[in-house]
From Swiss-Prot:
Cofactor: Zn(2+); Co(2+)
Active site: D72, E137 (proton acceptor)
Taxonomic lineage of the native organism: Bacteria, Pseudomonadati, Pseudomonadota, Betaproteobacteria, Burkholderiales
Transmembrane segments: none
Name of this chain's protein: Succinyl-diaminopimelate desuccinylase
Source organism per UniProt: Burkholderia ambifaria (strain MC40-6)
Superkingdom of the organism of origin: Bacteria
Pfam families for the chain: M20_dimer (PF07687), Peptidase_M20 (PF01546)
Record-listed Zn(2+) 2 binding positions: D103, E138, H352
């Protein structure tokens, strides 16, 4: 069994359901400390975070390449639906099964072993290697990566490149990497009406009827046309509720929850202003609470994307696709302190599902791609 596969199994065996790290980071810290990494645990409200760094010959003047990832996994769901226990690594038909196999314990193991091999081959490496690991990526993400980033900002720590080990591949390892993500902003809208008996509508004010024209306009609005890197911004309703459940009561208010996934072609302030303008145009009496969970970020072609594309081509023969599709990731926080952030990991077809797994044939090639990137950028 390869070193990468063995470490992957060791991590899968820890039932690290968010935000419980279950000592996964301790396992990683022991390996990294043996390489000369300075390891710092940063705890916050039950969340465990790790910042580990190994300086190179150039000291703080050298380029720093960070690997960002998470040890937490999503809940298993009904255990009886799993073919084998989710936290007992199992091999079937060339695949390794277990919660976190794809998202993202294989990536964690691969970069640890890649770092071990790189340091052994390049003991005098010039640049620095760092790990930014959290147990709060699958949960609220309020005490994880963002807290470490705030600490690094306060210290004036510079991060030149960051690989986030999210499972970005689709059919084959390396066919897709993410060089950016859309922003995410949600709204909670309450439209006020006047409750009353449904037989006496002249004595009431139906908030559903009031909201409907504005809702139709919001749904039909083209917020932007996207750009070279991002598709157009989308607006979607996630929840709509009004009434008591009775058939003879006009409700006193209608509640709507919605979400924007927005590109760099739009801004938070611009989108909010346009929503308010539409609601005001329809004369609604309302309250609207906004929450922004992430801003869009984009890494244009540069040293990191070139190194990753070269490494993937050398290891797999594939020409990778740079993409910004999908949901948010912790890359949105890291982009605040790092100009080049790219996500790359194994295929994502089974993530968050019963019987999550990874094809074993991708495990060591993933490690090799990571090692090749280290060699190109900081050797």
């Amino acid at each position: 069994m390869s070193a990468t596969l063995a470490l992957t199994e060791q991590l899968i065996a820890r039932a690290s359901v968010t935000p419980d790290d279950q000592h996964c980071q301790q396992i990683m810290t022991e390996r990294l400390a043996a390489l000369g990494f300075e390891c710092e645990t940063i705890a916050s409200h039950g969340v465990t975070n790790l910042w580990a760094v190994k300086r190179g010959a150039d000291g703080r003047d050298g380029k720093l390449l960070a690997f960002a990832g998470h040890t937490d996994v999503v809940p298993t769901g009904p255990l009886e639906q799993w073919t084998s226990p989710p936290f007992v690594p199992a091999h079937r038909d060339g695949k390794l099964y277990g919660r976190g196999a794809a998202d993202m314990k294989t990536s964690l193991a691969a970069f640890v072993v890649a770092s071990e091999e790189f340091v052994a081959a390049h003991p005098g490496h010039r640049g620095a290697i760092a790990f930014l690991i959290t147990s709060d990526e699958e949960g609220p993400a309020t005490d994880g990566t963002v807290k470490v980033v705030e600490l690094l900002e306060a210290r004036g720590e510079r991060v030149d490149y960051c690989i986030v080990g999210e499972p970005t591949s689709t059919a084959e390892l390396g066919d897709v990497v993410k060089n950016g993500r859309r922003g995410s902003m949600s709204g909670e809208l309450v439209v006020k009406g006047v409750q009353g008996h449904i037989a006496y509508p002249h004595l009431a004010k139906n908030p559903i009827h009031l909201l409907a024209p504005a809702l139709a306009e919001l749904a039909a609005e083209q917020w932007d046309a996207g750009n070279e890197y991002f598709p157009p911004t989308t607006w979607q309703v996630s929840n709509l509720h009004a009434g008591t459940g009775a058939t003879n009561v006009i409700p006193g208010h209608a509640d709507l929850m919605f979400n924007f996934r927005f590109s760099t072609a739009s801004t938070v302030e611009g989108l909010q202003a346009r929503v308010h303008a539409i609601l005001d145009k329809h004369g609604l009496e309302y309250t609207l609470k906004w929450s922004v969970s992430g801003l869009p970020f984009l890494t244009p072609r540069g040293d990191l994307s070139n190194a990753l594309e070269n490494a993937i081509r050398a290891e797999t023969g594939l020409t990778t696709e740079l993409s910004t599709t999908g949901g948010t990731s912790d890359g949105r926080f890291i982009a605040r302190i790092c100009p080049q952030v790219i996500e790359f990991g194994p295929p994502n077809g089974s993530i968050h599902k019963i019987d999550e797994h990874i094809d074993v044939r991708f495990v060591d090639p993933l490690k090799n791609v990571y090692r090749r990137v280290l060699e190109q950028l900081i050797a």
